[in-house]
Amino acid sequence: MKIVGVIPARFGSTRFPGKPLVNLKGRPLIQWTVEGAKKSKLLSEVIVATDHEGIKAAAEAVGVKVVMTDSDLPTGSDRINAAIKDVACDVVVNIQGDEPLVTGELIDRLAQVFVDDPKMDMATLAHPISAEELQSMNSVKVVVNCRDEALYFSRYPMPYSRMSAQEAGSMDGCLKHIGMYAYSRNFLKQFCEAPPALIEKAESLEQLRALYLGAKIKVIRVKEASVGVDTPEDLARLEKLLSSQGM
């Protein structure tokens, strides 16, 4: 089984234009992500998918293959599908380009799902949710079945509880979703060829298209999310964190 990791890195960003190239402790952000991904033991190859020559140069400087993709692709999944068009592989892991502290171990937990069950369609990550996160529309929730397969994703608190958030506390039936995925190559192609589903458009969550198509999505439980960079404020907090750790 050949498993590849793809890092989609688009230059344009509503909240943080040029984010993959911003300086973090002397290196472009994209290089941190690439170096973390290269520590995976299960990935055969790491590829950066981008629409910008500067990102291409930064990625090639740390020794990874780069595929140029259309800047108008609608989703990160479409960018990944385009990037592997000429790549022979069975499974692809979507590694977010704005996750500079991603670890090889985390990537391998996703990849291992397909080693254990080659018939799985997708895998993703989630961690315990707090009462505050449960009520936040910015926190995507996932509920799972007894096999830790996704039943539904939503921005809305779920499942419905007759108790208040304070009484319910951190609900075991609900997890906070982390937007990192692995797909079988065949399912990724099917996903990208399908039109957006009504539930996907209603919640603005592309993973709901996968559920609409009948996909099995394994949810891997982790203790906490890695640190993502969505805004300049996130970058400042991360720099402070790294400094406190002597990095």
Curated annotation (Swiss-Prot):
Keywords of the record: Cytoplasm, Lipopolysaccharide biosynthesis, Nucleotidyltransferase, Transferase
Gene transcribed to yield this protein: kdsB
GO aspect biological process, one term: CMP-keto-3-deoxy-D-manno-octulosonic acid biosynthetic process
Primary localization class, coarse: cytoplasm
Function, as annotated: Activates KDO (a required 8-carbon sugar) for incorporation into bacterial lipopolysaccharide in Gram-negative bacteria.
InterPro entries: Cytidylyl_trans (IPR003329), KdsB (IPR004528), Nucleotide-diphossugar_trans (IPR029044)
HAMAP family: KdsB
Organism (species): Bdellovibrio bacteriovorus (strain ATCC 15356 / DSM 50701 / NCIMB 9529 / HD100)
Reactions catalysed according to its record: 3-deoxy-alpha-D-manno-oct-2-ulosonate + CTP = CMP-3-deoxy-beta-D-manno-octulosonate + diphosphate
EC number: 2.7.7.38
Listed pathway(s): Nucleotide-sugar biosynthesis; CMP-3-deoxy-D-manno-octulosonate biosynthesis; CMP-3-deoxy-D-manno-octulosonate from 3-deoxy-D-manno-octulosonate and CTP: step 1/1; Bacterial outer membrane biogenesis; lipopolysaccharide biosynthesis
UniProt protein name: 3-deoxy-manno-octulosonate cytidylyltransferase
Subcellular location: Cytoplasm
Gene Ontology MF annotations: 3-deoxy-manno-octulosonate cytidylyltransferase activity
One Pfam match: CTP_transf_3
